[in-house]
Amino acid sequence: MKENYNYPLDLSWSTTEMTEVLSFFNQVEKFYESKVEKEVFLESYNAFKKIVPSKMQEKQLGRDFELSSGYSLYHAVKEVKASGKRFVSADKA
């Protein structure tokens, strides 16, 4: 993980929308750095998807976030959805 990085945000979003998107990015960071509660993570992802409904835009934001932070939105969402556990974290193999 990089120490300081920028979040990919769309300046046309409202303050509330930016807050929701940042909250989801924070959940992804938490997934990689410690652990997340599955329900909270998925609620945050669903709020993110209401703001970013386009798969193409989601992939672009995910690529930009990964280039900036080193964290993959795609893999975080995939692992959390597939997990049967209440708390989930990235496998640190």
Curated annotation (Swiss-Prot):
Pfam families reported for this sequence: UPF0223
Cystine bridges: none
UniProt xrefs under InterPro entries: BH2638-like_sf, UPF0223
Top-level lineage group: Bacteria
Family the entry assigns: Belongs to the UPF0223 family.
Name the UniProt record assigns to this protein: UPF0223 protein YfdD
Species in which this protein is naturally found: Lactococcus lactis subsp. lactis (strain IL1403)
